[in-house]
A protein has these predicted regions:
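Generic structural signal for short, solvent-exposed loop/turn connectors between secondary structure elements
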Residues: 1, 21, 50-51
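Intrinsic-disorder/low-complexity peptide segments enriched for small residues
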Residues: 8, 16, 24-25, 42-44, ...
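Short acidic DE-rich linear segments
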Residues: 115-117
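Acidic, low-complexity, intrinsically disordered interaction modules
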Residues: 34-103, 107
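Short, well-structured alpha-helical interface segments that form or flank functional binding sites
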Residues: 2, 24-27, 67-70, 74
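Extreme N-terminal leader/activation tails
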Residues: 1-18
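Short, charge/polar-rich alpha-helical segments
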Residues: 14-33
């Protein structure tokens, strides 16, 4: 079963008032991947920032990336608790490392992109 199929299965199993929480996994995956892209772009320093301006840009985008990552991890962990409660397959079975969650976010976004209509 693909990641999206697992998420759809969970969305179909939960009460209507929890479906938004399940959907937030996909939305937060996209937000996190976008935040990583923004931070990496700042690190590339294509605008040739200097000194404090450069450090500030990287720091600001890194903080946004970290917040997005935390939101994604929280959404995934809550969805997995829902999966346990409703007797369906967990959407995430990867490791506890933050990078593992990040890879999962990218896999979700890639799956959405590859199967877009």
């Amino acid at each position: 079963m693909t990641n999206i199929e697992k998420i759809k299965q969970l969305a179909g199993a939960v009460d209507a008032d929890l479906q938004e929480d399940v959907e937030s996994v996909i939305l937060n995956a996209g937000i996190y991947v976008a935040a990583v892209t923004t931070m990496e772009c700042a690190s590339l320093n294509l605008q040739n920032r200097k000194g404090e301006d450069y450090r500030s840009a990287v720091s600001r985008t890194d903080a946004a990336r970290s917040r997005a990552h935390n939101a994604f991890i929280d959404a995934v962990n809550f969805a997995n608790k829902l999966a346990d409660s409703f007797g369906v397959e967990k959407i995430y079975t990867g490791g506890p490392e933050r990078r593992d969650y990040g890879d999962f976010a990218f896999a979700i976004v890639k799956e959405i992109y590859d199967n877009r209509q």
